[in-house]
Amino acid sequence: MTKDNYDVASFMEQALVEARAAAERGEVPVGAVLVRDGEVVAKAGNRTLELHDPSAHAELLVIRQACAAAKSQRLPDCDLYVTLEPCTLCATAISFARIRRVYFAADDAKGGAVTNGVRFFDQPTCHHEPEVYSGMCEVEAGELLRSFFAARR
């Protein structure tokens, strides 16, 4: 449960549904769900191949959807649930959007930028540092990624 007594597992499961759908489209299986006041306001999976857009990461897609709906570039009352540790690109967008909390399932030792790599939120140039929680549904998210890449080798 989060501080607001919302069901973290339920939101992370919805992110996993988006990740599985991304895998079925041939995309790297990462899914994200953005939540405000216990309600899902946006959800997406990676679409970089489909949209021919290297920035079409699940996190950016949900941030764009929610900002458009809110008619604001800031989402300070929102929480992000994502199946993989955000990369530097996504961490930057999370910071600029002023997202309150980030929950991620699997660590990304190679491309992650929250607990790995540049640790973007710990940098003095970071505009906003959200609360970060990791490890929810980590095994399932990790296995989804491993099986996706194993099938392509």
Identify the residue ranges that each predicted region occupies.
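A short, polar/charged loop-to-alpha-helix boundary motif
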Residues: 50-60
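Short beta->alpha transition motifs characteristic of CBS
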Residues: 41-48
